[in-house]
Structure formats: C-alpha cells, structure tokens
C-alpha cells in the first residue's frame, strides 16, 4: 500500500480539511508510505508529518508557503525520500515512479527497474 497525492493549485481548496490530515497521520502510524508531488507536500505539513524531515517541491511553491513549511527541511532537490515519505518536484515524475516501485518491491531486478525508468522517460519506443 502507498498513498500518492498529486500537487497542483487546487490543493488550496482542501488543504485545511481535517479528514485529510487525520488520514495521513493514520497512514504513517500504520507504516503506509506517502508520496507527494510538489505542493501536495503541504498536506504533510498540515498533518505535522514533515516536521524536521527533508522534503522538496518547486521553489516557487516553497516560497509562497514558507510559513507553512517552516518546521520542515526544504532541499530543492528533484526528489527526497525520508523514511516513509517521498516528495518530488513535478519535473521528477519518472524518478518518483522508480522510488515508489522500489519502496513497494515491484522490480524483480535492476534491469527491470532500468527498463521501467527508460519507459517513463520516453526512451523505450
């Protein structure tokens, strides 16, 4: 199992919904990984999950929400993995897919993982 939360400007309409924070807290306490894309990392901060954890999103998103992210450690990297949490910029979706696959033990071997990565990058046509 894994929770994947896409980002986008629409998150601001539901960011303060308590049911989302409660669900994410239950996932973490049940050892269910959570992956977010860009601004969706804000859901993790609202649930107090990113406190003192490394995360990433677009710099513009971070700067617009600096106070929301003040207890987290912003890196600006393409992708961050911190225990059960994966955060990624929208420019790192192939890398995110690989990290999710590794976390869920979906690849039989390195060759399969490399082939999947190439496919995600549009290199296997």
Regions inferred by a protein language model and the residue ranges of each:
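Active-site-adjacent pocket-lining segments in enzyme domains
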Residues: 1-35, 39-125
